[in-house]
């Protein structure tokens, strides 16, 4: 497989992105959270996402395990309330608490 998204030096395959989004959306649907994730993502940075809606963020982990609590790391998968992928973003290379887009293949 090749990288679907690259965040800093971390290469994520589509299966990694799908797994993180699936976990985040499952928690969103059930109204549950793990260490406050998923939570609303307000897109203060003004990304041009390919899908609309209310956005939510969930960690995507650089060790490729699905997030189950603890430190969320720098990278996030963004999805909407219809379980559509908006994108993958990262704190890596951004100032403060801002995000920048991960590069997509």
From Swiss-Prot:
Catalytic activity: [RNA] containing guanosine + H2O = an [RNA fragment]-3'-guanosine-3'-phosphate + a 5'-hydroxy-ribonucleotide-3'-[RNA fragment]
Family membership noted in the UniProt record: Belongs to the ribonuclease N1/T1 family.
Species in which this protein is naturally found: Aspergillus phoenicis
Any one GO molecular function term: lyase activity
Alphabetical keyword list: Disulfide bond, Endonuclease, Hydrolase, Lyase, Nuclease
KW Nuclease (keyword) present: yes
Identification of the protein by name: Guanyl-specific ribonuclease Ms
Active site per the UniProt annotation: 39, 57, 91
Matching Gene3D superfamilies: Microbial ribonucleases (3.10.450.30)
Disulfide bonds: 3-11, 7-102
Cited Pfam families: Ribonuclease (PF00545)
EC number(s) given by UniProt: 4.6.1.24
